[in-house]
Structures are given as structure tokens and as C-alpha cells.
Amino acid sequence: VVGGRVAQPNSWPWQISLQYKSGSSYYHTCGGSLIRQGWVMTAAHCVDSARTWRVVLGEHNLNTNEGKEQIMTVNSVFIHSGWNSDDVAGGYDIALLRLNTQASLNSAVQLAALPPSNQILPNNNPCYITGWGKTSTGGPLSDSLKQAWLPSVDHATCSSSGWWGSTVKTTMVCAGGGANSGCNGDSGGPLNCQVNGSYYVHGVTSFVSSSGCNASKKPTVFTRVSAYISWMNGIM
């Protein structure tokens, strides 16, 4: 996350760290959201290579054991059949991970609330992106979970020339466009949007501009969760 600040520990209790095995260690690569006790929602581009994965729930500082973590292995990966790794702008950047064990819910580990099917946010809806991604373009990952204020940008604005143009589809959500943004390592994580006083995960972090994570008029682009509710229900 570029901009924003370090989150209060465990204040986004559905946020997970998706990690891959290399040698004898695991490394953070993407975020995700716990949506059932045995299921995580993330981005397709995070899991479209064959690796050994694990999911860490209740995490805050990636390098410190704070006692709230639950570490889960991944039983199976379900990538949307429409996903094409050569065309992230084509959409369908969503995947479900079936965990080998059920999460125990507590103050640090909670299920994300998902929006009703096909709900569209108005322009400038209050949202936060959360993640351990890079804190500047080409910079280091954040040890601690960060959050940044990222108000939604409606499709008409986001798809206009000078913004993202035709790269952005109606199955995506844009948010930000100013100094704050997602960045590499935030992918798959949530866009947490406030609707009627509660937070719902309206987006799965998908891509940013190649000219910089927080390039002007290039808001962070998310898979629109409300477009895939029936797809997810058909798998879980």
C-alpha cells in the first residue's frame, strides 16, 4: 500500500496473507479475504502458477509471531475459467482457495461480509485498501499490515480517456486515483467499503498502472466482487 498508515493490529480480521514455499521458508506474495471458515477469496493471478501455498490468518507483522496467527495449508485452488494470465485487463481475476482446516473465529479472525449480487458502488464511496504490499513503486513490502483511504471511482469516470479508458471493464471496481494506492504484494486482498455503516469487501485487488502504483488518474483496479457472487456460491 502506497500512502495511508499501519493498521491497528487485527482491525481487518478477514485479511489473510497468502504465502508460497521456497526452500524451507514461506514468503508473502498476495493478500486475500476469509469468506467462509474453510474458504479464502483472492486474485487468480496470485495462484495461477503451481506452488505450495499456505494462508496465515490473524496476521499483523509478517516477521513476528504475535500469538493470534492461524496457519492453514491450501487443499485446492479454484481459478475462474474466464481468467487468462496473458490478459489481466480481460477480467475474471478471482480465485477461491479451499483450506485444509476450518478457521477458528475470534477477535482477530472473522469472516468478510460480501455485497449483494451485482451491487454497484456510487462514485466516492468510502473504502479502504489493506495489505502488506510495497509502500512505494519498486520499494519494499510492508512488515505490518497497512490501510489507505481509497474512495471508489465510478465506471464512467474510470473508463474515460485520460483515466483507464477501455482497460477497465464493468466487472471491475476502481478506487483512488490520487497519492494513495495498492501496489505489488497487495493483489488478491480486499477493498473494504463502507455501506450503511458496515464494511463489505467490494473488490479483490487486481492491477495498477505500469507507470507507477499511484500514477495520477490511474486508480487501483479491483475485481468487482458483486459480479461473482453466484460463481462463488456455485463452488463453495
UniProtKB/Swiss-Prot annotation:
Disulfide bonds join 30-46, 127-193, 158-174, 183-213. The keyword Manganese does not apply. GO terms for biological process: proteolysis. GO terms for molecular function: metal ion binding; serine-type endopeptidase activity. InterPro entries: Peptidase_S1_Elastase_sf (IPR050850), Peptidase_S1_PA (IPR009003), Peptidase_S1_PA_chymotrypsin (IPR043504), Peptidase_S1A (IPR001314), Trypsin_dom (IPR001254), TRYPSIN_HIS (IPR018114), TRYPSIN_SER (IPR033116). Its EC number is 3.4.21.36. GO terms for cellular component: extracellular space. Optimum pH is 8.1 at 22 degrees Celsius with Suc-AAA-pNA as the substrate. The active site is at residues 45, 93, 187. Its cofactor is Ca(2+). It comes from the Eukaryota. Binds 1 Ca(2+) ion per subunit. It is found in: Secreted. Acts upon elastin. Belongs to the peptidase S1 family. Elastase subfamily. This is Elastase-1. It comes from Salmo salar.
